[in-house]
């Protein structure tokens, strides 16, 4: 009888766990009370990441170059019961980077997580035709500003005993997208930046990892998929024969920023449907 009772209790507990997992009741929050900054987070991949980090318990500060985008996103995510605030931030401007960090510190006491997602691409064509102005803009925002944004949060992370930086690169770093040469080059640079920062920041208990999304269906990438013939050609190169969704990137970012990934640093994870991804 005693054994039967123990078995019944075990079955009951197992069923309770399954039911909680399927309904979302008491969902585990691996980022509980962490403070996360996500740049370029009012649309596409950045928005999906911001939402997931908040769902996993983080206090998230979103940002965009336009106030109306920030206001809309904050209202939407707060309406979902998430702890989200936001501010305007052009990552290429020092005063904007400082304001973003200051908001997190003033509202939540510090910074634990940085997701560096901001990027630009003002050029489509042969790489040899890209002007010096194009190169300067792309490298300034996509690479230099990523370094400076990281530099801005490191002192705050140190005060809290460490942190996690997640840099968003692209599968174009490995397998160049056609007609996006300067953009591809900037994203390849981020792979090296991730490795260097990981080595230098490890003694401060700050981990640095990288996400390389493949062809994800966003407004930013529409030049690659709006044309039906090009879209089908791109899909043929994938093992998983579909375009990715922003949400496909969000879970892995949350994992890399959590304690579950505490022994992972300097790595790049490709979310690309099987796209070739080796330098």
UniProtKB/Swiss-Prot annotation:
- For this chain the motif Peroxisomal targeting signal maps to 277-279
Q: What class of enzyme is it?
A: oxidoreductase
What Enzyme Commission number does this protein have? Answer: 1.1.1.184, 1.1.1.300
CDD domains per UniProt: CR_SDR_c
Q: Which positions does the site annotation Responsible for the stereoselective reduction of 3-ketosteroids into 3alpha-hydroxysteroids and benzil into S-benzoin cover?
A: 177, 180
What keywords are annotated for this sequence in UniProt? Acetylation, NADP, Oxidoreductase, Peroxisome, Phosphoprotein
Q: N6-acetyllysine (modified residue): where?
A: 93, 217
Which regions span the lipid bilayer? none
Where does the entry annotate site (Important for the maintenance of the quaternary structure, the catalytic activity and cold stability)? 196
What is the protein's known function? NADPH-dependent oxidoreductase which catalyzes the reduction of a variety of compounds bearing carbonyl groups including ketosteroids, alpha-dicarbonyl compounds, aldehydes, aromatic ketones and quinones. Reduces all-trans-retinal and 9-cis retinal. Reduces 3-ketosteroids and benzil into 3alpha-hydroxysteroids and S-benzoin, respectively, in contrast to the stereoselectivity of primates DHRS4s which produce 3beta-hydroxysteroids and R-benzoin. In the reverse reaction, catalyzes the NADP-dependent oxidation of 3alpha-hydroxysteroids and alcohol, but with much lower efficiency.
Domain comment quoted from the record: The C-terminus peroxisomal targeting signal tripeptide is important for peroxisomal import. Once in the peroxisome, it is involved in intersubunit interactions. Three specific residues, Phe-177, Leu-180 and Asn-196 are conserved between non-primate mammals whereas the respective residues are serine, phenylalanine and threonine in primates. The two residues at positions 177 and 180 are molecular determinants responsible for the stereoselective reduction of 3-ketosteroids and benzil. The presence of an asparagine at position 196 is important for the maintenance of the quaternary structure resulting in stability at cold temperature and improved catalytic activity toward retinal.
Its assembly, as annotated, is: Homotetramer.
Question: What is the name of the protein in this document?
Answer: Dehydrogenase/reductase SDR family member 4
Organism, by scientific name, is: Sus scrofa
């Amino acid at each position: 009888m005693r054994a039967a009772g123990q078995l019944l209790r075990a079955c009951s507990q197992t069923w309770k766990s399954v039911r909680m997992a399927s309904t979302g009741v008491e969902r585990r929050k691996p980022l509980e009370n962490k403070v996360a900054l996500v740049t370029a987070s009012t649309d596409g991949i950045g928005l999906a990441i911001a939402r997931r980090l908040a769902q996993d318990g983080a206090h998230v500060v979103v940002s965009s170059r336009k106030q109306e985008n920030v206001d809309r996103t904050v209202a939407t995510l707060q309406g979902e019961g998430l702890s989200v605030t936001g501010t305007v931030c052009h990552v290429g401007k020092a005063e904007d980077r400082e304001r973003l960090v200051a908001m997190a510190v003033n509202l939540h006491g510090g910074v634990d997580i940085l997701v560096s997602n901001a990027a630009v691409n003002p050029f489509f064509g042969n790489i040899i035709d890209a002007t010096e102005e194009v190169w300067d803009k792309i490298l300034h925002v996509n690479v230099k500003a990523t370094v400076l944004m990281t530099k801005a949060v490191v002192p705050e992370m140190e005060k809290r005993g460490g942190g996690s930086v997640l840099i968003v690169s692209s599968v174009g770093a490995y397998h160049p997208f056609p007609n996006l040469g300067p953009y591809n080059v900037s994203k390849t640079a981020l792979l090296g930046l991730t490795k260097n920062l990981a080595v230098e920041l490890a003694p401060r208990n700050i981990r640095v990892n990288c996400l390389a999304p493949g062809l994800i269906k966003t407004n930013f990438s529409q030049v690659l998929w709006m044309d039906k013939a090009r879209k089908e050609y791109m899909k043929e190169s994938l093992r998983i024969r579909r375009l990715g969704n922003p949400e496909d990137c969000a879970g892995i970012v949350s994992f890399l920023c959590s304690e579950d990934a505490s022994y992972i640093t300097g790595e790049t994870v490709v979310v690309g449907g099987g796209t070739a991804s080796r330098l």
